[in-house]
């Protein structure tokens, strides 16, 4: 018999996370590493676990994540987005709760491009009157 698993893809900035929810005890593996070893900061671990804590499904699923691109904050946001989408596939009744919390919305904020004549996206060279 085939294993029951729920897939979800999350994105944030340049990061893409492919998330699999498998019935289990609440383990979170990111790129085959424990979440404690992957994310050094506690705040990033909290961000990743938010959808599971909100819906009360922390102990029902093992979370297997493959994430690439971007930095740590972008990756944490992408994982949260992917977990939320996978939870909706597992139980449609969770959708209003997750939508209200904003976990199903793809954060559209991206890095602004550098403009010519400037040092960065908005940072101008120092102005000298004389």
Swiss-Prot record:
The keyword Isomerase does not apply. It comes from the Bacteria. GO terms for molecular function: RNA binding; structural constituent of ribosome. Belongs to the universal ribosomal protein uS9 family. SUPFAM superfamilies: Ribosomal protein S5 domain 2-like. GO terms for cellular component: cytosolic small ribosomal subunit. Pfam families: Ribosomal_S9. InterPro entries: Ribosomal_Su5_D2-typ_SF (IPR020568), Ribosomal_uS9 (IPR000754), Ribosomal_uS9_bac/plastid (IPR023035), Ribosomal_uS9_CS (IPR020574), Ribsml_uS5_D2-typ_fold_subgr (IPR014721). PROSITE patterns: RIBOSOMAL_S9. This is Small ribosomal subunit protein uS9. One of its GO terms (biological process) is translation. Keywords: Ribonucleoprotein, Ribosomal protein. PANTHER family: RIBOSOMAL PROTEIN S9, SMALL RIBOSOMAL SUBUNIT PROTEIN US9M.
